[in-house]
Amino acid sequence: MNIKIAALTLAIASGISAQWAIAADMPASPAPTIPVKQYVTQVNADNSVTFRYFAPGAKNVSVVVGVPVPDNIHPMTKDEAGVWSWRTPILKGNLYEYFFNVDGVRSIDTGTAMTNPQRQVNSSMILVPGSYLDTRSVAHGDLIAITYHSNALQSERQMYVWTPPGYTGMGEPLPVLYFYHGFGDTGRSAIDQGRIPQIMDNLLAEGKIKPMLVVIPDTETDAKGIIPEDFVPQERRKVFYPLNAKAADRELMNDIIPLISKRFNVRKDADGRALAGLSQGGYQALVSGMNHLESFGWLATFSGVTTTTVPDEGVAARLNDPAAINQQLRNFTVVVGDKDVVTGKDIAGLKTELEQKKINFDYQEYPGLNHEMDVWRPAYAAFVQKLFK
């Protein structure tokens, strides 16, 4: 007999409630006399953050805030109620990503609703107010989730479209930015972690950007034989990235751009179309942007994988025609954190090649930063302020 069924039967026979018998096999819970605020993470009045984690049986708990490097690991202390905590110094306004290390096991914060919506969710987020990432009292655009059939991939797909406040589809056609997220992320990552809607709302309210649409496809195609989780990390550059980039490129040109052009009142000229992405999405932007140079007037890669480590014949051929690139692109932006250990060599190689071939580009290096959102959010905000002007 199943052990749980046997225990339940015994409990009922003994006059013990079935509810108690099931609960006895559940993890510990905070005492009902403790207010919830005493065992969940919170932003304090002075913009410090108190991280909390309820784990009365744990021996060691720490919180890792930001990129998982030694300086960002903070030991926590346990109180009599079994709540581990650590309070930060006063923080600047920003969105902070974090996770807990509980006796060697990585854990999200179960006391908050804000997790990073990756393909495998393994970190949480907390917003400290006081930056352009806030949801301010300004006119807000709309965020539309579109489910569609991709003929290129022969599957049902989803993408997100941000439209500016008051957009009705009437009047002059608007330009479009197509933005690709990074490896392991989803379209929601660009929205929730990247804060694209808030950035666009706030910059538009300040008159710093032109009205435009932002289209956020899923960088991962999940096509047959191109499932990210099927590849060990050592095979990503050699096998996965090239295969996925070609599939995503077909989807962009054959499905996504035609669908957006049909469903929304948007410009169809190259100067009215921008393409950008971060990390793996930066590689996607480079591949599609260079292979279809005539279709885009603006291009950006933020800490992107490049052909320095992942060759692409189309990109290589286009980079050998500097005059065509300089004539076609109104702006080509390349961004990286100077401590980037993931794609730093990629960007360095691309930068050298662009300089040697005298290809025009804007270059921004963020000091002291790694492969992280503290590079990509400011880079995104800076790039959209250049567009369509």
From Swiss-Prot:
InterPro entries: AB_hydrolase_fold, Esterase-like, Glyco_hydro_13_N, Ig-like_fold, Ig_E-set, Mycobacterial_A85_antigen. GO terms for molecular function: acyltransferase activity, transferring groups other than amino-acyl groups; hydrolase activity, hydrolyzing O-glycosyl compounds. It comes from the Bacteria. One of its GO terms (biological process) is carbohydrate metabolic process. PANTHER family: DIACYLGLYCEROL ACYLTRANSFERASE_MYCOLYLTRANSFERASE AG85A (PTHR48098:SF1), ENTEROCHELIN ESTERASE-RELATED (PTHR48098). This is Uncharacterized protein YieL. It comes from Escherichia coli (strain K12). The lineage of its organism: Bacteria, Pseudomonadati, Pseudomonadota, Gammaproteobacteria, Enterobacterales. The gene is yieL.
